[in-house]
Amino acid sequence: MSSIQQNIEHITSQIRYDEQKCGRTPESVQLLAVSKTKPVEAILEAYQAGQTAFGENYVQEGVSKVQHFAEHYPDNRIEWHFIGPIQSNKSRLVAEHFDWVHTIDRTKIAQRLNDQRPSELKPLQVLIQVNTSGEASKSGVTEAEVFELAELISRLPNLTLRGLMSIPANVSDYESQLHEFQKLATLKQTLEAQFPEIDTLSMGMSGDMTAAIEAGSTMVRIGTAIFGARDYS
């Protein structure tokens, strides 16, 4: 058994344990393998171990991986998630190649993704990125701006609003982590009254996954714990 396969099995077991401990429905939390900077060989290894959802942060790198698997493994069942910032000049590539986008934080990007989504593809599944910590260094709309952006997305035929995503403040104690995640979970509950179709909370990474699951996360984004340390060289 490869180390990547072992890591996936270990993390999946931890997710199932956390679900049970919190009284969550079994298998209600999806594992998103963050494969940025990782070679296609590592992604293939994870895919062969049963992992089907992968997250990419960089447009060019992500598109090259999508194209590689489409060419060499045309029957693959990989679901590609874009989880990085989107520049206007790169939006077409995202619209044409990815299945999900987690980082919509302004109307201009939502409109461009809608207009540039090829008609033969299913609607792009999208999440609104919310800046729950209020840190200027983090992207995302404020909680007050979420409803206006959600209203716009709901009217765009080539986008399907699925929920919310956040990158919380970097805190190490469990209660602070839980508090951060509960903000987004509460916002999702409020949003559901107007948009009952939303079902996704993308929150939680290696260091705060357990708190995210307790707060209601439905998708955790795990990279290093699956693939090892990243190489940015």
Swiss-Prot record:
Pfam families reported in the protein's UniProt record: Ala_racemase_N
Keyword Cell wall biogenesis/degradation: no
UniProt KW keywords: Pyridoxal phosphate
N6-(pyridoxal phosphate)lysine PTM positions: K36
InterPro entries associated with the record: Ala_racemase_N, PLP-binding_barrel, PyrdxlP_homeostasis
Record has Protein transport as a keyword: no
NCBIfam families referenced in this protein's UniProt entry, alphabetically: YggS family pyridoxal phosphate-dependent enzyme
Protein purpose: Pyridoxal 5'-phosphate (PLP)-binding protein, which is involved in PLP homeostasis.
The protein's name in its UniProt record: Pyridoxal phosphate homeostasis protein
Organism placement in taxonomy: Bacteria, Pseudomonadati, Pseudomonadota, Gammaproteobacteria, Vibrionales
